[in-house]
A protein has these predicted regions:
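A basic- and aromatic-enriched beta-loop-alpha substructure that forms the phosphate/nucleotide-
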Residues: 70-144
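Binuclear metal-dependent phosphoesterase catalytic core
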Residues: 205, 214-233, 240-277
Length: 277
């Protein structure tokens, strides 16, 4: 099976257009594609005006779904900006629901042939809930200043508040447990984990290797988890705006971000990456 991969497209900075030259069966959109609040119900009659940005985003998803048999989309951190953590994924499912081959995953799976994709943001564990990291990252990263969390309870009650580093660590734990239970005992099946935040410190550029606290907002240390689950053959992520491609046991870990067009040099030379599983 051929799998094409891109993350961190950041359509708010500029459009991106690419073809399926490799004949990939699946395209992975690994988060930070666009901000949820900027995309509304599709109106092909309104191509300018206040919905111009929204229609650009719809056009991007439409092109992807026309050129690739299947498209998997998981949200990153930026999709939530200026919105509510609890409503981001439902909003995308609502406004993009007209695309039948677009699979939006959040702690969910989708299977094609003998490969099961496990998708979700996979926030970090904040350096295993290190107190300094939980405190400092809340001040250092926009994620915890411009994302609300309505904290709805099962009976429908809720209270206003910001999305916090503790919320992120809790969501990390829930995602890891979902992966664990999904792959448990299924050694005859191939699994691909599609996340946004990195599962390993190996996805850290050398210039940042000594920044313990900040790295806690970008990656976790799931190397042993990956080694303990050899049925996971591929793990994709984004978030770092750096290319990575390495092995942890039988699992290939790959990151292929576009980045900020007109702001990062890598974005001007970015190319779609295709893998085989």
């Amino acid at each position: 099976m051929k799998i094409a991969l891109v993350s961190d497209v950041h359509l708010e900075f500029g459009d991106l257009d690419f073809d399926n030259d490799s004949g990939a069966d699946v395209l992975i959109l690994g988060g930070d594609i666009c901000v949820a609040n900027d995309i509304t119900q599709h109106d092909p009659q309104n191509i300018m005006g206040e919905d111009y940005r929204s229609n650009r985003y719809h056009n991007f998803f439409q092109r992807c779904c026309e050129r690739f048999p299947h498209v998997i989309f998981i949200v990153g951190n930026h999709e939530h900006y200026h919105g509510d953590f609890q409503t981001t994924v439902p909003h995308f499912r609502d406004v993009l629901g007209y695309l039948p081959n677009l699979h939006i995953l959040e702690k969910q799976t989708w299977t094609l042939d003998d490969v099961t994709f496990i998708g979700g943001t996979l926030w970090t564990d904040m350096n295993q809930r290190d107190n300094r990291t939980l405190h400092d990252i809340a001040r250092m990263m926009n994620d915890f200043r411009c994302v609300d969390n309505s904290n709805k309870t099962e009976d429908g009650r809720g209270w206003p508040g910001r999305f916090t580093t503790v919320d992120a660590a809790n969501d990390h734990d829930a995602m890891v447990e979902f992966i664990r239970t999904t792959v448990a005992g299924r050694y005859d099946q191939k699994f691909v984990v599609v996340g946004h935040h990195s599962p390993s410190r190996l996805s850290t550029h050398p210039r940042y290797k000594d920044q313990f606290v900040m790295n806690g907002g970008y990656s976790s240390q799931l190397d042993d988890f990956i080694l303990d689950h050899p049925q996971i053959k591929l793990w994709t992520h984004g978030h770092t705006h750096e290319d990575f491609d390495y092995q942890i046991g039988s699992c290939r870990v790959v990151c292929n971000p576009r980045g900020y067009i007109n702001y990062e040099e890598r974005a001007d030379t970015w190319k779609l990456k295709t893998l085989e599983v």
